[in-house]
């Protein structure tokens, strides 16, 4: 049998064909850490006794979870990263003011490219599969070993193929597609497998693809990955500062399952507490009152997400019982929102706009929920206590549904506020 797209990339890295289930050691193209995971990795790296990192250009350190620093402990965490980067001459350390949410920032800076093998000490490292590379989350000890050796080990995953057909309806986006898929297969439906997306992928923008790949981990997947096409090429062009290689799956590649996803049939989706698989069509939600709306994150903080929110919020007001928080994912996105007038309209509507941070998504800072409060968020997880008090609730949706709901005061379709 032939090789899947993920297996093709891994095979090229070790110089022979791999098969599902075998353990392999692979050279990595990028090693990523943030202000939660990198300090642990740095301490482990120092225990190894290496004088230098394997390659100062292939490590990215991005403080994003608790920045700007929310307290003394978070400030100390970032300082560990800062000192380590300076000591080892690490090129890709992104200080406050230059930083962004890591999984939006690295593609934007051209640090992850088609055909790469990327590991990150963050579970949503799978985001970069939108660019036809193998990217996956690891623990801090694996990050430490990779910083020292430039290598990581994996069990080669089996794969599930998702064949996309049709086109997206108005107000339906990549977030709705991945919520629909997770609702269909469950949070363990792709456990340690590669989710490979093919078919009519041209119906999805690159931002849609980032969103879908980002949430592959919410189905338990090892990685998510899209075919390379002209949309991928257009995004990478002008960002890539080195050569990259494009891979294609074999026609006779073996998949554990194959799903056909008809995009025409997907309506806006909402994931109810406390799992991303608890999805319902917007038409089945009922009248769910909300206290807070969050638009942003590594899942939905890109420019197209901001544009959708702008189109819905322009000339309208946030409901008096709702707090709307908007987080552009990078400084570049933030600046473009300023230039286009999005920020002005957000503020006029009654939203609070923040510098890039992961803060509210993980219940870290800048948007914590109190007991009994209910949030609708464009983030990727809605576990118990994810955004604050254990007795709060988090619902997940697209930016379109989130913006519309901020106006209405309860979860609604964008069609209801047009």
UniProtKB/Swiss-Prot annotation:
Pathway: Amino-acid biosynthesis; L-leucine biosynthesis; L-leucine from 3-methyl-2-oxobutanoate: step 2/4. Pfam families: Aconitase. It comes from the Bacteria. GO terms for molecular function: 3-isopropylmalate dehydratase activity; 4 iron, 4 sulfur cluster binding; metal ion binding. It catalyses: (2R,3S)-3-isopropylmalate = (2S)-2-isopropylmalate. Heterodimer of LeuC and LeuD. Catalyzes the isomerization between 2-isopropylmalate and 3-isopropylmalate, via the formation of 2-isopropylmaleate. This is 3-isopropylmalate dehydratase large subunit. It comes from Thermoanaerobacter sp. (strain X514). The gene is leuC.
